[in-house]
Amino acid sequence: MKIPEEEVALLEDYVSDSVDHRGFPAGKSSTGGWRSAWFIIGVEVAERFAYFGIACNLITYLTGPLGQSTAKAAVNVNTWSGTASILPILGAFVADAYLGRYRTIVVASLIYILGLGLLTLSASLIIMGLSKQRNDASAKPSIWVNTLFFCSLYLVAIGQGGHKPCVQAFGADQFDAEDPKEVIARGSFFNWWFLSLSAGISISIIVVAYVQENVNWAFGFGIPCLFMVMALAIFLLGRKIYRYPKGHHEEVNSSNTFARIGRVFVIAFKNRKLRLEHSSLELDQGLLEDGQSEKRKDRLNFLAKAMISREGVEPCSGRDVDDAKALVRLIPIWITYVVSTIPYAQYITFFTKQGVTVDRRILPGVEIPAASLLSFVGVSILISVPLYERVFLPIARKITKKPFGITMLQRIGAGMVLSVFNMMLAALVESKRLKIAREHGLVDKPDVTVPMSIWWFVPQYLLLGMIDLFSMVGTQEFFYDQVPTELRSIGLSLSLSAMGLSSFLSGFLISLIDWATGKDGWFNSNLNRAHVDYFYWLLAAFTAIAFFAFLFISKMYVYRRLDQV
């Protein structure tokens, strides 16, 4: 029986697996798309403004009012940054299994605001305490004020851990994965998302860092708190036009996703001694082209044993096995990405400390805080994203004959190569800074400005923006796209957790090298006697090794969808 044209049009106007704020099927004309995505992008701009208002100058605060050594402060910053980047896994689990993305964002925002408020309070108490002891050069904040500061700092990490993976996944949810036009729009969403949040980061770095160093730290921490309140208000304004994943508006418990995928591994292990029938393999490979099936035959067939029917045990479905395989395939990619992102930890630690030692005048009489150098990352992204969208992708599409221009893995690999060159550049610039310090007899005068312009450091920050555009955005889109639909918050949290783990690895390397080389080694508190350039060469080598491993793994990777191959 032929379906009337009116009914076809009506069916096409709704998005499968999505509902509106009332729980009814989400209409394309009234919900989602760019109209709701811009609300969510606005939220992320405000959130990144708040986060980087704390992160960009944290090492200066730790070595200043808190009186920590450079090495200890770098480890503390890396530990906090790493924790903040790994917590999104927990936030994504809570969202995908229990609360849903919308509710998780609201709860996480409230925790975020509480943490920023307490951080402002602790900074006020520290300022008041130090002002009473201004004649004592060795004065440090009391233990309980220190404790309040670090507790509030980690409360911020918890808040952003719930906020970060859910906001981006919720934004991508606004585009219909079954509509070819909206799929391409979703790819653009990730690019413009990154450009917008980079604008927020750049403004934060310029404004907040200046306030912190030239007004006071309490006011400098209070501004991010105000912006986070604004972020929550903006998010709630768009409630009626959002598309919500269907599972979180019905009685369906998304934790079943974790259970069914976990069950694949359990049943496959129990069936490990059974022989796999050829029909099971065909079922598992049915959605792939012949070339891709051949590619898959020798790998992960162990998990297909979960589909074998056995007395007393219900077999897993082909979909469950495919979802489990998709997660397993991501692990090697994730590991190489973790190693390649260790250099990221340096731009809020050693890059900033190096900037403090040089001539920071950008114009006669105009001196900028060292942390403001981070704004050049945003400038690079603001220039690179439109060029990538309007110039690079059209050319790539003509060459490759593919709608996406280049694959997501090719995009990530390009970012890794740029990261190697960036660490080499950073090492050369630091070598020059040390040479100038020696030539002017400033090796033992750390408080005297090294006569080297801060503009020497700008290229490595501009290159960081390009690395973010290729590697970070590519990784976020890749993990979002390649995980099961119900676990997309988890997918995005995997890319974020890689950044977190790399921060921990960076902190571990710093502690290990500092212990091995002694107080006059690579990380001397007097940077004119240190050798941070050696550390940068080491990171360049690690990143190069990670890239070649990534290259080998990516050649064998099987995409979940044929249009990504």
Curated annotation (Swiss-Prot):
Identify the SUPFAM superfamilies for this entry.
MFS general substrate transporter (SSF103473)
Q: Is Membrane there in the keyword field?
A: yes
One of the record's GO cellular component terms? membrane
Localization in the cell? Membrane
| Topological type in the membrane | Multi-pass membrane protein
On tissue specificity, the annotation reads: Expressed in shoots, roots and leaves.
Q: Which residues carry this modification: Phosphothreonine?
A: T104
Q: What is its main location?
A: membrane
A Gene Ontology molecular function term for this protein is: tripeptide transmembrane transporter activity
Query: Which InterPro entries does the entry mention?
Result: MFS_trans_sf, NRT1/PTR, POT_fam, PTR2_symporter_CS
Q: List the transmembrane segments.
A: 49-67, 80-100, 110-130, 142-162, 189-209, 217-237, 331-351, 368-388, 409-429, 454-474, 490-510, 534-554
Q: Which UniProt keywords apply?
A: Membrane, Phosphoprotein, Transmembrane, Transmembrane helix, Transport
Q: Which family does it belong to?
A: Belongs to the major facilitator superfamily. Proton-dependent oligopeptide transporter (POT/PTR) (TC 2.A.17) family.
* PANTHER family attached to this UniProt entry: OLIGOPEPTIDE TRANSPORTER-RELATED
Q: What is this protein called?
A: Protein NRT1/ PTR FAMILY 5.15
What is the protein's species of origin? Arabidopsis thaliana
Its gene name is NPF5.15
